[in-house]
Regions:
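Zinc-dependent deaminase catalytic domain
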Residues: 1-166
Length: 166
């Protein structure tokens, strides 16, 4: 390789943005599920990021992080309170329109996040995991995304690793 040749082992755009999602997910204080999201313009510029957590002003020291079983008190579980990574990324965006953008997520979006993705004008979704594929929320999500013409596809891990030491 001459000094004028470009490096051949640079990470791809998908690797880069999914890496940002993974790093964002590490900001979540949820002990059981950490999700990250990254919204990108058609020309590969990061527009916004988000992770799952409580809304502004709702202390993560006061609100519950517990999961809930059907017979338990729903007010003492996280589900009524946590804002999902996708919605946080959409709400964190301070620019104009998200029309035509791509959202990268570490977990396939639920039906509520799918509504926000569709309404915001995002046209492509890249996801890492789809572990809740058989749930009504994800089935409804896919139905809406399909109807709205939002393209989605799984991220294809390359097996490469990058180490970050803090």
């Amino acid at each position: 390789m001459s000094e004028n040749d470009k490096r051949q082992d640079a990470i791809s755009w998908d690797e880069y943005f999914m890496g940002i999602c993974t790093l964002s997910a590490h900001r979540s204080k949820d002990p059981s599920t950490q999700v990250g999201a990254c919204i990108v313009s058609p020309d590969h510029k990061i527009l916004s990021m988000g992770y799952n957590g409580f809304p502004k002003g709702c202390s993560d020291d006061i609100f519950p992080w517990a999961k809930m079983k059907a017979e338990q008190d729903p007010y003492n579980a996280k589900y009524f309170y946590v804002t999902h990574a996708e919605l946080n990324a959409i709400l964190n965006y301070q620019g104009g329109s998200l029309e035509g953008a791509t959202i990268y997520v570490t977990l396939f979006p639920c039906n509520e996040c799918a509504k926000a993705i569709i309404q915001s004008g995002i046209k492509t979704l890249v996801y890492w995991e789809d572990i809740y594929a058989d749930t009504p929320a994800v089935k409804a999500s896919k139905r809406m995304l399909d109807a709205a013409g939002v393209r989605y596809y799984p991220y294809q891990p390359t097996g490469r690793s990058i180490t970050i030491e803090f």
